[in-house]
Regions:
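A SIS-like phosphosugar-recognition module
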Residues: 2-3, 13-227
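A short, hydrophobic C-terminal helix/tail in secreted or cell-surface proteins
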Residues: 6-9
């Protein structure tokens, strides 16, 4: 959130903490259920717990190391009027949340879509002026990674502009993307959350570049009171 939100209390209308907190709570619940039902053994459960406990420190490091890269990416692309955010599997809701934040604070057109469904109409939108932002899973998540790379190649073949967040060691994604930010290796469990936070940062810096009122986006209320 912006300095206004930090300095004067929670006045920010487009909350980044809500989606992240809900997703992490759901993950913690799933881990507890998995352990209690015998789907996870004690060793796996404790390992995942340690990964989650390391998350705040990891995010602090990433924010310090990658904020400059995200700011630079925002400056390069802030004139883009149309965005498609794409991810496979668990990265699809990450794409949805990230597209929502982009449209809320920048007033640009942004849609979150599943990367595996491009041929169901989405490809007709592809042209150089439409930028596609991909959330690329770690290469070790073989199935999700392969499906994401196929989608990237389909858009590249049709002349679309490709932006992406990918993890260190992914030479395949690096060679295909026009603009990209490389992330350090992280546990599979928290990889989607890392990308979500950086995408929220990308929306923030894009809004700053466009001189939007980030704390109070136009036409938005703190809570929705009507159906």
């Amino acid at each position: 959130v912006s300095s206004t939100a930090r300095g004067r209390g929670d006045v920010y209308k487009s909350l980044t903490k809500a989606a992240l907190a809900q997703a992490l709570l759901l993950l913690r619940t799933a881990l507890e259920l998995g352990y209690s039902e015998g789907c996870l053994n004690s060793k796996s459960f404790q390992s995942h717990q340690k990964e989650l406990e390391s998350f705040p420190e990891l995010i602090s490091i990433l924010l310090n190391e990658k904020s400059g890269f995200m700011r630079n990416l925002a400056r390069i692309t802030s004139s883009v009027q149309n965005w498609i955010f794409l991810g496979c599997g668990i990265y699809y809701p990450v794409a949805m949340e990230s597209a929502l934040k982009m449209k809320e604070v920048t007033y640009l057109h942004a849609e979150g879509m599943p990367a595996g469904f491009l041929k169901h109409g989405t490809l007709s939108m592809i042209e150089e002026s439409v930028h596609s932002l991909f959330f690329v899973p770690p290469p070790a998540e073989v199935d999700l990674h392969n499906r994401t790379i196929i989608a990237i190649e389909e858009i590249k073949t049709r002349g679309g502009t490709l932006v992406g967040l990918y993890f260190e060691g992914d030479s395949q994604a690096k060679s295909l993307l026009d603009h990209a930010v490389e992330l350090p290796p992280v546990p599979f469990l928290i990889a989607p959350f890392v990308q979500m936070i950086l995408a929220q940062m990308f929306a923030y810096y894009t809004a700053l570049d466009l001189k939007r009122n980030i704390d109070k986006p136009r036409n938005l209320a703190k809570s929705v009171t009507v159906g």
